[in-house]
Amino acid sequence: MTTHVTLEDALSNVDLLEELPLPDQQPCIEPPPSSIMYQANFDTNFEDRNAFVTGIARYIEQATVHSSMNEMLEEGQEYAVMLYTWRSCSRAIPQVKCNEQPNRVEIYEKTVEVLEPEVTKLMKFMYFQRKAIERFCNEVKRLCHTERRKDFVSEAYLLTLGKFINMFAVLDELKNMKCSVKNDHSAYKRAAQFLRKMADPQSIQESQNLSMFLANHNRITQCLHQQLEVIPGYEELLADIVNICVDYYENKMYLTPSEKHMLLKVMGFGLYLMDGNVSNIYKLDAKKRINLSKIDKFFKQLQVVPLFGDMQIELARYIETSAHYEENKSKWTCTQSSISPQYNICEQMVQIRDDHIRFISELARYSNSEVVTGSGLDSQKSDEEYRELFDLALRGLQLLSKWSAHVMEVYSWKLVHPTDKFCNKDCPGTAEEYERATRYNYTSEEKFAFVEVIAMVKGLQVLMGRMESVFNQAIRNTIYAALQDFAQSSLREPLRQAVRKKKNVLISVLQAIRKTVCDWEAGREPPNDPCLRGEKDPKGGFDINVPRRAVGPSSTQLYMVRTMLESLIADKSGSKKTLRSSLDGPIVQAIEEFHKQSFFFTHLLNFSEALQQCCDLSQLWFREFFLELTMGRRIQFPIEMSMPWILTDHILETKEPSMMEYVLYPLDLYNDSAYYALTKFKKQFLYDEIEAEVNLCFDQFVYKLSDQIFAYYKAMSGSVLLDKRFRAECKNYGVIIPYPPSNRYETLLKQRHVQLLGRSIDLNRLITQRISAAMYKSLDQAISRFESEDLTSIVELEWLLDINRLTHRLLSKHLTLDSFDAMFREANHNVSAPYGRNTLHVFWELNFDFLPNYCYNGSTNRFVRTAIPFTQEPQRDKPANVQPYYLYGSKPLNIAYSHIYSSYRNFVGPPHFKTICRLLGYQGIAVVMEELLKIVKSLLQGTVLQYVKTLIEVMPKICRLPRHEYGSPGILEFFHHQLKDIIEYAELKTDVFQSLREVGNAILFCLLIEQALSQEEVCDLLHAAPFQNILPRVYIKEGERLEVRMKRLEAKYAPLHLVPLIERLGTPQQIAIAREGDLLTKERLCCGLSMFEVILTRIRSYLQDPIWRGPPPTNGVMHVDECVELHRLWSAMQFVYCIPVGTNEFTAEQCFGDGLNWAGCAIIVLLGQQRRFDLFDFCYHLLKVQRQDGKDEIIKNVPLKKMADRIRKYQILNNEIFAVLNKYMKSVESDSSTVEHVRCFQPPIHQSLATTC
């Protein structure tokens, strides 16, 4: 039966798809996210103690005491948190400045309203510390009673008392440190007294007591000391507590860093409490009751330990403030000022790395079989296999704890020993205390060591977290097997002996242990067990099947078993003879071994919590102690002083490749701190501050990382594209242009879901956004750089674009960027506009700089800047100063490319024209050509036309070519006289030639652009040939057939033939595009299209004024001697610029280049006057005569021979120009006029015949 689903349900189901996790191949370079699952806590705090009625009643009672003491320790922890996280309220409240202030009552009322709940907490704290001291002293008094001094006291009980000692030390130090607490209470007290809130004597007395309690330093310690000293034998119990801490510390009977540091603090504070008026620790040491030398060694190895948050304690201070220190100072080495090797983390790194590699290798072996293959929970393992996994889990936790403790210990030592400007030259004298303790207190090597250790801790946490279910299974199986084997099997022999020897007390303890923990196969103890009767097992043995289950003991059950086992092997007992003496040596050894191993059972049963605690580095962020020291000057410290950001920023600033993959691990310290602030401190404001810092730091992180990645790939592209010969030549001269060192950004670029403060951040997307912006800015900067320079810089623009294109290609392997063409169009402002910034600037440069200021040299085929500019160089905007990576990638690359580019800077030639063709494309070139034609039109129909009209007027009306008999000197003098007005025309060599130069340069630009465009098109055609099935003819041997070889070649390249491929696989639109592209590529060169022909035709249309051709000839054919046509005027101009100049003068070619001749010759050709010019040119006639007579005289200050040489050079140049122009014009004429127009003239008749006729 089909079910109907509504549209709303369907849409909601689709929305739910977004929440499905999609596993990817993202490299794991960050710590594990907080588990969504609940963390089960099976610690009942002995609430189920009454269920174990079979246990020894004394230990059940002791469990009751434990329970109440643990509750008091939890309450003490809450007050420690309250004190540590206390922020001054009174500083934020307006102060009453004088008694006459009108709103003082309102201020005082608000002060009381705000501070009363806080003062109530302080009052409760004072009562609590009294109650805690009283409770502790009562326990000490009870245990030190004369009748109970020889009673057995369990290690767990002694450790609980040790935790009390630690709590007193911590609370007292916190109370001493917090001046803001005293200030807030004073402000409240002042306001309350004014408002008469405390009228009754009891309230006044309590307030006074609180004031004294807060004001007196070490008040808790003093009260505790005073009350302990009146208890007889208290030092014996404290000695037991200190000794158990020494033993635990020495044998590494701790797991978490906090447990390790607690043992040391209890040793130190315990010694301080023991050393007083009543007892002397040095006498106790002499009696071997305690071992001061061992404690001294511990304190020398670890001089500073964390006290609470960022508060640290120097352990030697407990010794130095003890009563009998001065006379026994020589016995202590820990009080001497020396740095322990423990704090040199760089030297420790060799061992840490070795431990890490060994453990990771072993863990990977299990991980591959358990997690990757999925056989972890399904397969049943042997006890040995479970034991191996159990040991592996324990060793992993111990390693993590060791590394975390090491980091915290070095950090603590640095906080206690801040640097200064003498120790660190980078540290300014005005640096704050916290800044000197964090920002300037670590060398680069120490920061890297910190990062590496943190990465090891967090990385191993990930691996062990993945195997949590496997470890938990193995832990429960192993603990169950160990307990059951020990209780059901190992304890049979001592029970048999105890029954046989009738040791009732021992029997009761052993039976209590078995009844407390045993899980019998049949549900009850076998009644026929011979050991219960003290008998030997039968010869075949008594078969006891111990079951196997994955069930661990409860916390109370484990406590009862361990305590009862401990009572069997303890040196103390309530009776004269200890129970230990009733047991055999091997049994005692077995019990001791089991008791030692079972110490870690509690931690391992709570594996998830233990793993989190062993990896907790949250205290690296908290700074309440140092904030308190600023006395309100700082609300919070900047990120530059925050350890997580210091470490992260150090990696980013140094760009160390080996550390780059660790960059996310320091940021996880914020996760630790935020978790601690919410779950342990339970302070929202601390979390808010962490979150605010994370927001700022992560923005900075993405900003810096994105810039680094872009700079790296830009430098890589610049290095790849740098000319190899140039690099080799630099190397020969000792200049090394390095490649950027390989870095590991790829792993970071694959991060799609970075976990930070519960957020899943797509780092790849954020980096993509910034790099897209950087790429756009880089392209914009390249174009802006081109816009700020002349036309020669277009070569540099292409290089910059090529480097950016390669950068884009490299980055696109990891990031989803827009296409390069789209980015370039956007930067070029060419998205919707028909032409972009490049095209506009090319035309702008052509119009305002290139045409008026460049001279063309036909020999080199280059334009160079004129020696004498006739126009001012245009003003260009300077490009903005940017980082080197926005140009070529780095400073060395910028210098290298600048040197290469300098060879293209002083001319405009074929490289520049090819670049213009590639960058502007057909559309851009068409725009530029159109605008150039407008300039040429305005010149030919404006300035040039006016000058032509003026010069035609000053030309001689008739100027015949003199006969050869006059000789070249005479002819020169004749022409000089005839053209005197032209020669002396002031504006001829300036404005007239300048205008013609601009026309000539424009024509030349069009010609050279077409030549460059043709080369580019040929290149495109050759590249496209294999994809268009255009194959070269192959070489064939004798006897071979060409058709067969060609068919074989066509078959080989058939997969590359694009059009059939698209026709078979593409859409109709794609097929149409492919066909059109194929047709365009094939036909654009085959058609023989010529742009320059069109240009010349358009220019010819601008020469419509009659002045260009002159009036109709009187003879009806042509003007011979009359100077009315343009070619005669150009002959006169040519005569002028052929006259040699003086020594320090510039020639016409230096000032105007060949562009001047191109303009004149082009106009002559377009007017159809080339042959007349060749026949009637004044200079050519002079050259012809001079070549015949070979004379060399100076006529009118003009050296004849030099002038003839110049004429010859220009004649050659003119012929070349005419040849080029005629090549294009003849094709035009042949196309336009297929019929040749012939005009017939009557033959000439002699005058004598004419008269006769």
Curated annotation (Swiss-Prot):
GO biological process: apoptotic process; axon guidance; cell adhesion; cell morphogenesis; cell projection assembly; regulation of actin filament polymerization
InterPro entries on file: CYRIA/CYRIB_Rac1-bd, Cytoplasmic_FMR1-int
A GO cellular-component term linked to this record: neuron projection
One Pfam family per UniProt: CYRIA-B_Rac1-bd
Domain of life: Eukaryota
Keywords in alphabetical order: Apoptosis, Cell adhesion, Cytoplasm
Entry's localization field: Cytoplasm
GO molecular function list: small GTPase binding
Task of the protein: Involved in T-cell adhesion and p53-dependent induction of apoptosis. Does not bind RNA.
Family statement drawn from the similarity comment of this UniProt entry: Belongs to the CYFIP family.
Protein name: Cytoplasmic FMR1-interacting protein 2
Gene: cyfip2
